[in-house]
């Protein structure tokens, strides 16, 4: 951990170093929780995702909001609090959830499920004030069982505000299992070449009135095929650009997709599949 004392150093580490860091963090989580108690499985499952987030975003400026907050231990370790982790959840020690009074890297207090997409308010405030920070909401631990999450998703999708929502799906069976063709198509949709080609196609087609008409026709045909094969219809119907499902323990791919999502001028939902308690 001494090699990565400062969160900012993660932006320049290699993929191999990121993978090594994830293993170090897993051992550290087990060490800390064995002494202080607390949610072990959810934190072990979010290691690669949290490292990837810190490779892309600057949490001293960007807003990273955890739903519930029980999976924030790696975030705390990477933002100057690793040496205090033995005081976790003790009187006078650091909190077991994000706490702005504790660090500038904690955007707001969490503790209740289904509230993270309320970060839409931060995104709207950013736009109106002419600021340029990024906004990310991390959903997990059954947050989609609460109606408040769907209200937030509906409003965020229709707002058009640049906002990234990450769905940490650790086995809640949100979608039906996918067949071979659907899995292949999902992988193709995540490739950089596809993402770049789609943006170029969109700009060309929207440049002229006939192009816009053709774009709408092709878009409807594509949606009909995609809806029958891929588990993204609900989120795209809400107005999100859907990406996934993706392996939540592949830190290289996660970093690439988060970097892309951070540059999209609109709401993005990244669906990440993780294993609770991985490495334990």
Name what the model sees in each region.
Residues 67, 138-139, 164-168, 271-275:
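Short beta-strand segments
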Residues 171-280:
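Long, well-ordered, tryptophan-enriched scaffold segments
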Residues 10-13, 17, 21, 37-45, ...:
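Catalytic cores of large soluble enzymes that bind and process phosphate-bearing ligands
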Residues 1-79, 234-240, 245-258, 265-275:
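N-terminal amphipathic, basic-rich helices that act as targeting or association modules
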Residues 39-159:
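Cofactor-binding active-site loop characterized by glycine-rich and histidine/acidic residues
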Residues 29, 57, 156, 170-171:
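A generic secondary-structure signal for well-formed alpha-helical elements
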